[in-house]
Design a protein with these regions (language model features):
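Catalytic binding pocket for nucleotide-activated donors in carbohydrate/polymer assembly enzymes
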Residues: 221-333
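Active-site-adjacent structural elements in folded domains
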Residues: 155, 211-216, 269-271, 288-290
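A Trp-anchored, charged/polar loop motif used as the substrate-binding/catalytic surface
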Residues: 145-157, 213-214, 225-226, 232-235
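Short, solvent-exposed loop/turn segments at secondary-structure junctions
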Residues: 120-123, 175-179, 208-212, 235-237, ...
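Extended, non-globular alpha-helical segments
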Residues: 194-219, 272-274, 278
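Charged, often glycine-rich, active-site loop that binds/positions anionic groups
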Residues: 129-134, 214-222
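Secretory-pathway glycan-assembly enzymes, especially type II membrane glycosyltransferases
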Residues: 2-209
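A generic local structural motif
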Residues: 156-158, 214-218, 238-239, 260
Length: 333
């Protein structure tokens, strides 16, 4: 059994299907090691060119969504006191936040000030901050979204299986405890408790300490042999939502409460994903419905693919990121 477990771990490491961290770190450090003058020239050139492109409306719409700041609503003295100059920005504890934000910020004058808030941000800061995530509800203007921790969150797949070729089951693999405390991710815990052992579900928990539910991790490819994949929020958003929506399986989840660069707040229930109640009481009925109505299931998959396509153009993603920061610096100075 021990040998099988070791083999399984090795198989997962080699076939997880996740983004290569080595490649990510090499390209990120190359990007931020470029001279400031070169990055500044690149930013001005690429934005000037984009203004005459046919997707300028889409670009500006997304910039306004990520950055909702209005100068009149900002506590400027508090911002000036708390924010730091780009030239003084130290590397964050988890370097991905620094690398993903600074690759764009370095193209601006380095005396500009900002407040970079790393990690899973589930509250709204009291001054304008650059964040990965924010609550969908409430006045969230101070939470300015950038594409942070991209190596973990932004992953799309090429799914070779059609929806009709997949198993009529729901799959879930994930953590149900918080890595930094003894509390539980209550929504995930409730789901596992309710459905573990149900033959229509393949459920496993990857934390230690939940022996009755504990299983090995599954590769993305293994997830994709199921029609329905649970996308349950963890510390903030469900990090698997992007790759599920790029596949021929369907994301199943309650209404999201947090959003990131993926604009989860704009997703339409039962159009981009299957929405279930927060207590999961309608989950089995909804799964039955879409098993029996494969055309409607396929429509959701098609809409999800259209949605994901908006995020697939690397040049446009770069332009939007730079414009989000441009508005941030203009509004807060």
């Amino acid at each position: 059994a021990k040998k099988m477990k070791m083999n399984r771990k090795l198989y997962y490491i080699l076939h997880s299907g996740k983004n290569s961290k080595l490649r990510y770190y090499i390209t990120s450090y190359l990007w931020i090691s470029m001279p400031h003058c070169l990055l500044s020239w690149f930013r001005k050139t690429i934005i000037s060119k984009a203004q005459h492109g046919n997707d300028w409306d889409e670009i500006t719409k997304r910039v306004e969504y990520y950055n909702k700041l209005h100068r009149s609503e900002i506590d400027l003295p508090a911002f000036q006191q708390k924010a730091i100059k780009l030239s003084e920005q130290k590397k964050t504890g988890q370097s991905v936040y620094y690398l993903d934000a600074f690759r764009y910020a370095k193209s601006f004058p380095l005396h500009r000030k900002w407040w970079l808030q790393p990690g899973d941000v589930t509250w709204i800061p009291d001054i304008p901050a650059i964040v990965k995530s924010r609550p969908i509800k409430g006045n969230n203007a101070n939470s300015v979204l950038l594409k942070l921790d991209r190596v973990r969150h932004f992953l799309f797949v090429n799914d070779r299986l059609k929806f009709t070729e997949k198993a009529d089951k729901v799959v879930f693999r994930g953590l149900i405890g918080q890595f930094d405390s003894n509390t539980l991710k209550q929504n995930r815990y409730s789901f596992v408790k309710k459905f573990f052992g149900n033959p229509r579900f393949n459920i496993g928990v990857i934390d230690k300490g939940f022996n009755e539910w504990s299983t090995e991790k599954m590769t993305i490819r293994e997830h994709l042999s199921y029609k329905f994949i649970m996308a349950l929020e963890g510390n903030d958003v469900a990090s698997n939502l992007k790759w599920i929506m790029s596949s021929n399986s369907i994301a199943v989840m309650p209404h999201p409460t947090y959003e990131t660069w993926f604009m989860e707040g704009t997703l339409i229930p039962d159009y981009h994903y299957i929405e279930v109640k927060a207590d999961y009481s309608d989950l089995e009925a909804k799964i039955d419905y879409y098993i029996n109505h494969p055309d409607e299931a396929q429509s959701i998959i098609n809409h999800a693919h259209e949605y994901v396509d908006r995020f697939r153009n690397p040049q446009r993603e770069c332009i939007i990121s730079m414009l989000v920061l441009d508005k941030y610096f203009r509004t807060t100075q």
